[in-house]
């Protein structure tokens, strides 16, 4: 079974995170940051990954450390759960509309970390949440998974809708990439390793 559990404790945060790539059981997410909880719930639903997160962070300062550390821990768990990546599709991409907004995600579980984030988030805050942290979250996930991740908002007006379309697109593209394909023998690379 493709699962991973990680506890990550720093002077700024304490994160407990577990994933099961092959279970769509209901997720439990409690980061102390309402907007992040909402986005992670959407991600879990659309990726069909069971995701459980408990985070305590120095949110009295701001949400930055918690958002980034949840992303780091999610990336570490994804990398561990994927193991040698035998027989996975490796690539995934999708467009997701959210009302007037259209988000796009393409990713490659190549073992090479890179993030392209092209999203104009015109509203700097949604409630208490700094929208610039969305890019920080995806950077942390991509670099700790070893994932080449491209995210783009093609158009839209509402910042919440733009971000939501990206999290849903990320989930759906990741589901495509991690799906085991019986036609792929070994890893999906001419190098023989990912």
UniProtKB/Swiss-Prot annotation:
**Where, per UniProt, does this protein localize?**
Cytoplasm
Major location (coarse): cytoplasm
| Superkingdom of the source species | Bacteria
Regarding protein family, the annotation reads: Belongs to the imidazoleglycerol-phosphate dehydratase family.
Gene Ontology annotations of biological process type = L-histidine biosynthetic process
SUPFAM superfamilies listed in its UniProt record? Ribosomal protein S5 domain 2-like
Q: What is the lineage of its organism?
A: Bacteria, Bacillati, Bacillota, Bacilli, Bacillales
Q: Which InterPro entries match?
A: IGPD_sf (IPR038494), ImidazoleglycerolP_deHydtase (IPR000807), ImidazoleglycerP_deHydtase_CS (IPR020565), Ribosomal_Su5_D2-typ_SF (IPR020568)
Ribosomal protein is among the record's keywords: no
Matches recorded under Pfam families: IGPD
Q: EC number(s)?
A: 4.2.1.19
Q: Which gene encodes it?
A: hisB
For this UniProt entry, the molecular function terms from Gene Ontology, in alphabetical order, are: imidazoleglycerol-phosphate dehydratase activity
EC class (word): lyase
Question: What keywords are assigned to this protein?
Answer: Amino-acid biosynthesis, Cytoplasm, Histidine biosynthesis, Lyase
Catalytic activity as recorded in UniProt: D-erythro-1-(imidazol-4-yl)glycerol 3-phosphate = 3-(imidazol-4-yl)-2-oxopropyl phosphate + H2O
Protein name, UniProt field:
Imidazoleglycerol-phosphate dehydratase
Organism source for this protein?
Listeria welshimeri serovar 6b (strain ATCC 35897 / DSM 20650 / CCUG 15529 / CIP 8149 / NCTC 11857 / SLCC 5334 / V8)
| One CC-aspect GO term | cytoplasm
Q: In what pathway does it function?
A: Amino-acid biosynthesis; L-histidine biosynthesis; L-histidine from 5-phospho-alpha-D-ribose 1-diphosphate: step 6/9
């Amino acid at each position: 079974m493709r699962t991973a559990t990680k506890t990550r404790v720093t002077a700024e945060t304490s994160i407990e995170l577990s994933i099961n790539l092959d279970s769509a059981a209901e997720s439990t997410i409690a980061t102390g940051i309402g907007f992040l909880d909402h986005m992670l719930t959407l991600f879990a639903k659309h990726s069909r990954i069971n995701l459980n997160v408990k985070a305590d962070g120095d949110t009295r300062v701001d949400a930055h450390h918690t958002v980034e550390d949840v992303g780091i821990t999610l990336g570490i768990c994804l990398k561990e759960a994927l193991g040698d990546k035998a027989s996975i599709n490796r690539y995934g991409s999708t467009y997701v509309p959210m009302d007037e907004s259209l988000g796009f995600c393409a990713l490659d579980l190549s073992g090479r970390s890179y993030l392209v984030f092209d999203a104009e988030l015109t509203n700097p805050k949604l409630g208490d949440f700094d929208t610039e942290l969305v890019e920080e979250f995806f950077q942390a996930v991509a670099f700790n998974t070893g994932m080449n991740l491209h995210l783009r908002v093609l158009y839209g007006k509402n910042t919440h809708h733009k971000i939501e379309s990206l999290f849903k697109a990320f989930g759906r593209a990741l589901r495509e990439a991690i799906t085991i394909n019986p036609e792929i023998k070994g890893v999906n690379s001419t190098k023989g390793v990912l």
